[in-house]
Amino acid sequence: IYGSKVQYTASMYWVLGFIFLFTLGGLTGIVLSNSSLDIMLHDTYYVVAHFHYVLSMGAVFAIFAGFNFWFPVMTGLVLHERLAKAQFIVMFIAVNMTFFPQHFLGLAGMPRRYSDYPDSYFMWNQLSSYGSLMSVFAVLLFVLIVWEAFLSQRSLLFVDATLYSREWSDGYFPPDFHSNIYQSYITIYKTYYSK
């Protein structure tokens, strides 16, 4: 969240989604740190939901944030912003629909690594399955967005209008030959940092 002025781009949506999901997974980790509860919940779907919130969605959302942010730097093309935001919303709803009901399944005692379960777990399992299908749709939508960016060849209009981070200071692509002989400098404008 560079420069303390948050711009709600698609990559910022992914960053904020990562922070939310990682925090929620961390809060369930606090529950599991209680040894008496951990004995009861250890081999249940509560643990599955916990580590998917922390590890899987944490990594996936951070990767999507980085890809959305650095795609223009890597290719010189821009992703369709509205479609990228829509893809985030679909994915955010889908992963919460997949893994949040698993907390209730774990609290109800549904064990891990079983091939068949009683019918009392059907409703939450069905909701979780619909969420996973929705996640597949969100990933296919992401592939479609990248494909559309390459087909439309929508390039950056102004390199100067981009962010003031190190990645954007050298232009579109890395030079063909790079050495540490010549240093590049970043110009810091006084208007951005004056009080």
Swiss-Prot record:
Keyword Nucleotidyltransferase in annotation: no
Binding site for Mg(2+): 42-43
Reported function: Component of the cytochrome c oxidase, the last enzyme in the mitochondrial electron transport chain which drives oxidative phosphorylation. The respiratory chain contains 3 multisubunit complexes succinate dehydrogenase (complex II, CII), ubiquinol-cytochrome c oxidoreductase (cytochrome b-c1 complex, complex III, CIII) and cytochrome c oxidase (complex IV, CIV), that cooperate to transfer electrons derived from NADH and succinate to molecular oxygen, creating an electrochemical gradient over the inner membrane that drives transmembrane transport and the ATP synthase.
Protein residues bound to Fe(II)-heme a: 52
Source organism of the structure: Albinaria turrita
Reactions it catalyzes: 4 Fe(II)-[cytochrome c] + O2 + 8 H(+)(in) = 4 Fe(III)-[cytochrome c] + 2 H2O + 4 H(+)(out)
Cofactor: heme; Cu cation
Protein name per its UniProtKB record: Cytochrome c oxidase subunit 1
Record GO terms (molecular function): cytochrome-c oxidase activity; heme binding; metal ion binding
